[in-house]
Amino acid sequence: MSEQTQTCASEIQATNVAVQHPKSEKINLMNLTRKEMRELFAEMGEKPFRADQLMKWIYHFGEDNFDNMSNINKVLREKLKQIAEIKAPEVSVEQRSSDGTIKWAMQVGDQQIETVYIPEDDRATLCVSSQVGCALACKFCSTAQQGFNRNLTVSEIIGQVWRASKIIGNFGITGVRPITNVVMMGMGEPLLNLNNVIPAMEIMLDDFAYGLSKRRVTLSTAGVVPALDIMREKIDVALAISLHAPNDELRDEIMPINKKYNIKMLMDSVHKYLEVSNANHGKVTIEYVLLDHVNDGTEHAHQLAEVLKNTPCKINLIPWNPFPEAPYGKSSNSRVDRFQKTLMEYGFTVIVRKTRGDDIDAACGQLAGDVIDRTKRTMEKRKFGKGIAVQNH
């Protein structure tokens, strides 16, 4: 293992230790992969297939009550009730857009995270968070303004999928498209929480859980290169790179992670990932948020084309979602069109991501941040004897 990879691994481990969530006396079964659940059942003197049955109840049927698991005998159900629980994050606030997008603030301990459901004509995508806040401090990101609090556990990651599935109809309620895709593009940097993100994605892929194709699970990263190299050896899912700048000088300014792992280092790691991945069809997705007169000029498009000339990719151009006190502006339609056309002249596949949820808090992290701020204000008022209740939605 390289010195750089060792450093990254130690950073991840240190972060996990520093922010451990208080443990329940009972085992939360949502923290376990099928292999780990089988090991638990073996310790209980039970056959491995019982673990398979239990996973089906939890993830196929959305069941969190052992008493309702009819093909598991009563003695085993009673054993499970003594030592285990099935616990997912609860929704504290829900916002529904006129275009069908649903955004939830979910409670994890005493903190808030965000999960977003995005229905389309041929699919429904769930955008999942991996951390409470984020340590990377990208200047254009609402979540980054909150700072980093802690990593999410496996159950808090996969539990977002479970909770959303229960709400929008994966478990037999009609009228809403079931979740077909999951993207790790919510709050946080997934590669700084590998210990929990990888098992959560394994559950997403497991046929006894959600059985998603590895092409339908996407991890988006700002470029923690050593962690990407580790992930390459552990799991194969679709990969998206949050690039957002065509040169190191600009990327250093808007994405401080680039000072540690620059564009060349990142793209070298991406090429290694593509060499072994079946999930990506030989192409990586490049994400590029457009900031008015910062990174959206024709010269930037030419520079980006040069950076990506040897990388099989599709490029997603993302209209920036403003948030309070942000230092940037949203690119005009004409600048977006010109940027897209310039890249297409080089032969790239370039898609301008359709803006969703315009009538709700669209910027990632904004809803959770608003809930946290409102709760803090409420607690401060209570502290000084004003006793105002938290606003219900």
Swiss-Prot record:
Provide the cofactor list for this protein: [4Fe-4S] cluster
Q: Name one GO molecular function term.
A: metal ion binding
List localization entries: Cytoplasm
* Gene Ontology cellular component annotations, sorted alphabetically: cytoplasm
Q: Which residues bind [4Fe-4S] cluster?
A: 134, 138, 141
A Pfam family reported for this protein in Swiss-Prot or TrEMBL: Radical_SAM
Stretches assigned to the Radical SAM core domain:
120-359
Write out the catalysed reaction. Answer: adenosine(2503) in 23S rRNA + 2 reduced [2Fe-2S]-[ferredoxin] + 2 S-adenosyl-L-methionine = 2-methyladenosine(2503) in 23S rRNA + 5'-deoxyadenosine + L-methionine + 2 oxidized [2Fe-2S]-[ferredoxin] + S-adenosyl-L-homocysteine; adenosine(37) in tRNA + 2 reduced [2Fe-2S]-[ferredoxin] + 2 S-adenosyl-L-methionine = 2-methyladenosine(37) in tRNA + 5'-deoxyadenosine + L-methionine + 2 oxidized [2Fe-2S]-[ferredoxin] + S-adenosyl-L-homocysteine
Q: What is its EC number?
A: 2.1.1.192
The record's section on SUPFAM superfamilies has:
Radical SAM enzymes
Q: Which residues form a coiled coil?
A: none
* Residues forming the catalytic site: 114 (proton acceptor), 364 (s-methylcysteine intermediate)
> In which residues is S-adenosyl-L-methionine bound?
188-189, 220, 242-244, 321
Q: Which UniProt keywords apply?
A: 4Fe-4S, Cytoplasm, Disulfide bond, Iron, Iron-sulfur, Metal-binding, Methyltransferase, rRNA processing, S-adenosyl-L-methionine, Transferase, tRNA processing
- Example GO BP: rRNA base methylation
Cofactor binding note:
Binds 1 [4Fe-4S] cluster. The cluster is coordinated with 3 cysteines and an exchangeable S-adenosyl-L-methionine.
Q: Which family does it belong to?
A: Belongs to the radical SAM superfamily. RlmN family.
Q: What else is known?
A: Reaction proceeds by a ping-pong mechanism involving intermediate methylation of a conserved cysteine residue.
Entry's HAMAP family?
RNA_methyltr_RlmN
The entry's function note states: Specifically methylates position 2 of adenine 2503 in 23S rRNA and position 2 of adenine 37 in tRNAs. m2A2503 modification seems to play a crucial role in the proofreading step occurring at the peptidyl transferase center and thus would serve to optimize ribosomal fidelity.
Q: What's this protein's name?
A: Dual-specificity RNA methyltransferase RlmN
Source organism: Actinobacillus pleuropneumoniae serotype 5b (strain L20)
List the taxonomic lineage. Answer: Bacteria, Pseudomonadati, Pseudomonadota, Gammaproteobacteria, Pasteurellales
